[in-house]
Amino acid sequence: SLFGILSTLWSELTFSNYARLLTDTPFLRWMLNSLIVSALAASVAVTVTTLAGYAFARFRFPGRKYGLLVMILLQMFPAGMAMVAVFRLLQVMGQATGGWIGLNSLLGLSLVYIGGGIPFKTWMIKGYIDSLPKELEESAYLDGATPHQTFRQIILPLLGPILAVVTVFNFITPYSDFIFPSVLMQSGDRYTLAVGMQGFVSGNFSANWSLFAAASILGSLPILALFFSVQRFLVQGLTQGAVKG
C-alpha cells in the first residue's frame, strides 16, 4: 500500500523541468549575478573584517572603544530601516559614476552587503583573536618578526575556523536575499537568483512550481560546494578544546 501511495505522488520521473529552466528562462544569468555579488561581498568583507578584528583585538588606539560601541549599535537596527537611505545613496552614486556603482548595478549591490556585514563579523573575529594567547606574538617579536609577519605567519593560520564561518555567512546572505535586490535591481538581466525565482510563482493563476522547485535544487549547488570546501575548518573549530592535552 505504501508503494501505491508513493506512485500516486510521483507517477512519472522526468527531467524536463530542468531542461525548460536552462533553455527557456534566464536562470543561468540570475545565478551568475548571485555568484558575482556573493563572491565579491564575501571576499572583500572577509578581508576587511579580518584586518579590523585583529586591530581592535591587539592594538590600543584613540577611538577604539567608541568604534566597537558604534558597531554594536549598528546591529540593533534591522537592515530594512536603511532601505530608503541606501536607495537614495546608490541613486546619487550612479549619477556620479555613470552607472558603474548605483541602482541596477551588481557592484552597488555588493557594496550594500559588504557594508552591512562588516560590523558583526568584525566582532566575531575580534572575539576569536582575543581567545588566542598573546605569548605567540610576543615570541615572534623576540625572534625579530615584524607586526606584518606576525599577523601573516602566526595569527592568520590560526583563524581558519572563524574565517570559514565568516565566509559562509557573507556568501549565503547576498546569495539568498530577496529584499534588497528586488528594490535595487531594475532590469531582468540584473536580477539575482531569489528575485528571478520569485517570478515563477508570483502570478495568481500562473504559478509554475515545477520550475521553481527545479531552480531551488540547482540554486543550492553553490552553497553545498562552499560548505564542502570549508567543512574541515568548521569541524576543526567545533572540535577545538574537546580533547585535553
Question: Locations of the language-model features?
Answer:
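A structural signal for multi-pass alpha-helical bundles of membrane permease subunits
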Residues: 1-245
